[in-house]
Every structure is written in C-alpha cells, then in structure tokens.
Amino acid sequence: QAIRLLDNIATYKDKNKAFYQLNIGDKSEVKNQNSDKIEIKAIIDNIEHSQISYNSEKDISIAPFPNIIYISASRKGATSTIPLFSNFEIGPEGENVLNVIEHFSDEILADSLQGEAEGKTFSYVLSGWLQKISPDVKFEPKLAKQADISYSLYDQHRSSNVGYGLSYSLPVIVALLLGTLNQDSLVLIENPEAHIHPRGQYEMSQLICLCVEAGAHVIVETHSDHLFDGIRIFCKENKTSFADKVIAYWCQLDENKCTKVDSCHIKRNGKVDNWPQGMFDQFLIDAERLI
C-alpha cells in the first residue's frame, strides 16, 4: 500500500486525493497508533534512478516514478464477465485483462519465457503458462467491445464453471509478462498463489523468477511456502547468480502493534541465511508432531 500511495501522490499531487483513491481512508486511519506522523520514501535505482517521498507534515517531494502494475489479492475470479476499459492497462482486480491480452497478443517475449509454448508471442506464452498452472486446459478470451464486457472460456466452459485457480492466476501471469515488455514498470502482486494447488504454486514461482531474469521488476507478497521454496530452488539451479537479485522480508507485529521487519538472504545454493522465527516453518512443526 505504501508504494501505491506514493504512486498516487506522483499522479495526483494531492495528499488527500492520493489517500482516498486507494479506499484506505485518510492519513489518520493508516498511521500507526504509536507514530506522530507518516513518512514514506522510495528510491528506485534501476529505473532511471527516481525518488519520491511523502511526509504528512511537510510538502511532497516528487521525482519520476515508475509505472505501477498492481494485482490485488482480491481479484475478479470466476465471474461470467470481466469489465473492459478504453485503455490497455490491467486493473487491480484483473479488470480489462482480456483487452490487454488482445492488444499485446503479437508481442515477442524473451526466449526463456517460452517453455513448452507453441510460440514466443504474448498469447502463446500466456496459454503455455496457464497450462502449467492447470494442465491441458484450453484458454479462449472473448471480447464484446460494444458492450464494454469480456469473458473467457476454459475448455469451452465459462469461468464460473471451472476452478478459481485459472481465473485468479490469469491477471497475475499477464502482469508478469507485461513487466518484461515494460521494464520501466514495477509489478506488485498480492498472493499470486491464491486458489492454486501446490504444483501450480511452484510453477508460478518459476514464472516470477524467469520474468525477473527477463528484465521485470517484481514485488510479491505471499503466504505460500511452496512459492518461497520454488524461488529457492530456482536460485540453486540457475547458473546466472539469480540469488543476488532476490531480497526477502518477513513482516509481523510486535507487542506494541508495530510492524517488525526481518530480512533474510537466499544464497546461491538455495539455503537461507538469518531465517526469521515463524517464517514458513509450520510444515516442519506439524511434521514433527505427526512422526
């Protein structure tokens, strides 16, 4: 939310509007109860070195800020129709995703993203990764532009009649692929693992890593040990020092309801330095009780 707030400030240059556009209330609602003010600063080193800061008691400091591609944890899911916009940007809940797919369908993507897809274009690669998430499913986007709606078919079934995993993963995959085409953008994804079975979560982790290797800038918020372990495996098996591109943070509240942030480093062998207590350890805890 902090990054999205800075993005809105850069867009609207109005503190109050920047807050309300995100539906998070005013600054009094998002400020920690133990803080006197809100202060946020972002420095983007690899995207034309831009910087923006916000202080609730001072003027806003604005410099160029990257385009944000944001996919919320609350996505449209298995709905019969998806809204269309007049632009080619994907909405936070996956709105306009089929219009975006049509617009970029013939764009050539990096060779590393192709995998087992039939071709290197956006549409082929997208279909290929959807099949990795849910094997042998045929995806068909349908647009009714005069009615400003769209819908998708999976094996000739409407999305409301198939599992949530496909419709929930679709905007995530599209956002990641867009990040490789627009490398001045920042891709923010909440819970890419939502409604996906463990094998599919692993495949999603591989796509995230491949897109970062292809030039995308990605921030992921996840509760999935399958996703995290998949990234660790990619670090171990990749020969291009991918681990050096990964930063992991573990956030939890302390006794004063303040957010405590611990960082850990994934080494090139996939092992983790400074593993924070409580981070993705429930499987081991449960396994010990079952043995």
Identify the role of each PLM range.
Residues 1-4:
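Glycine-rich phosphate-binding P-loop
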Residues 6-184, 262-291:
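Phosphate-coordinating catalytic segments in nucleotide- and nucleic-acid-processing enzymes
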Residues 114, 194-195:
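Short, contiguous strand/loop micro-motifs
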Residues 190-191:
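Walker B catalytic acidic pair
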Residues 202-291:
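C-terminal lobe/lid and adjacent interdomain/linker elements of RecA-like ASCE P-loop ATPase modules
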